């Protein structure tokens, strides 16, 4: 191994990988397949790699990320929008696979984003199951919406058959998700804690366990930012705009939205908080986002303290 410390950027496409480093020195173009991953790992093993950054590319990056994490590298899967804004900020307007790899390496060096943890096999499997359930649920919604519009009996029957198949598959996945959680002591306890909060059901719990494994390990500001629920101020001189949320994990945020809608009906603490915001003239979108953030902070505190929900105020929540 050489003693030079490198930040590595990898641009991932469906069939190819472009690799660059900062400081410059490492330039590779490889196939995005097991042989290409092995070649990449062999090259990286010759250097002292501080951080590897890739962009989220619709799932094409996931097998490589698993290989890198399994080998012990610090890995970040960056938001493409954040990386593109960074590129514009450093004056790089051109965009090719090779340039993207160089920008990712420079982003890793200058921004040094927080590396992701290596998920356990149980958590990785759970994440895949939860993602698949979300996909099937989306298909079910589309087919269900088509049914009232279908006038031909044969077409209606066709849609009904597809709906039945999707409902069966979703039910089977629910069983697999439950079995996966029950088979792991850590996941089972975390699930028990999360579902102890009124408004949080099995679906939201499974999403949090699989797609927000940092729950309980970060402070309130960090966990809110990770889910895209941290308000960002917009100010310039004496002018102050409305604070907005931005970025974060969309799937987690969507599930928390549904959980918050339920909580303002059945969870006295969240309902009181929501009504207070309404009495202050807050719009629904602002109030429900605040409820989502409050629920997430409460869940984060409960998991960190390894305790179940109590109507009494929670310290640091």
Which residues does each predicted region cover?
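Basic, amphipathic alpha-helical segments enriched in Lys/Arg and hydrophobic/aromatic residues
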Residues: 279-317
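Short linear capping/connector segments at secondary-structure termini
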Residues: 119-124, 153, 158, 190-192, ...
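Phosphate- and other anionic-substrate recognition elements at nucleic-acid/protein interfaces
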Residues: 1-168, 265, 286
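Phosphate-backbone recognition surface of nucleic-acid-processing proteins
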Residues: 202, 206-280, 284, 311, ...
């Amino acid at each position: 191994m050489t003693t030079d410390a490198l930040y590595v950027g990898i641009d991932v496409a469906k069939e190819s990988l472009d690799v660059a480093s900062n400081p410059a020195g490492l330039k590779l173009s490889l196939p995005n397949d097991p042989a290409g991953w092995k070649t990449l790992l062999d090259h990286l093993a010759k250097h002292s790699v501080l951080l590897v950054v890739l962009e989220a590319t619709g799932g094409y990056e996931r097998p490589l990320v698993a290989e890198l994490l399994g080998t012990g590298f610090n890995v970040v899967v960056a938001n493409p929008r954040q990386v593109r804004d960074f590129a514009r900020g450093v004056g790089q307007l051109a965009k090719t696979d090779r340039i993207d790899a160089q920008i990712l390496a420079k982003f890793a060096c200058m921004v040094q984003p927080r590396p992701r943890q290596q998920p356990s096999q149980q958590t990785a499997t759970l994440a895949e199951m939860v993602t698949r359930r979300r996909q099937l649920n989306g298909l079910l919604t589309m087919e269900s919406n088509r049914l009232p519009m279908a006038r031909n009996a044969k077409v209606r029957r066709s849609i009904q058959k597809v709906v039945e198949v999707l409902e069966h598959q979703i039910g089977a996945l629910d069983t697999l998700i439950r079995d996966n959680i029950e088979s792991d002591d850590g996941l089972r306890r975390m699930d028990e804690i999360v579902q102890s909060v009124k408004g949080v059901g099995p679906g939201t719990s499974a999403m949090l366990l699989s797609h927000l494994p940092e729950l309980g390990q970060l402070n309130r500001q960090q966990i809110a930012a990770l889910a895209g629920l941290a308000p960002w101020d917009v100010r310039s001189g004496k002018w102050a705009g409305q604070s907005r949320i931005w970025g974060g994990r969309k799937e987690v945020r969507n599930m928390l939205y549904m959980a918050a809608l339920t909580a303002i009906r059945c969870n006295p603490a969240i309902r009181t908080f929501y009504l207070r915001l309404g009495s202050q003239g807050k719009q629904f979108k602002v109030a429900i986002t605040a409820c989502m953030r409050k629920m997430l902070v409460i869940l984060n505190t409960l998991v960190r303290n390894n305790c179940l929900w109590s109507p009494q105020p929670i310290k640091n929540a």
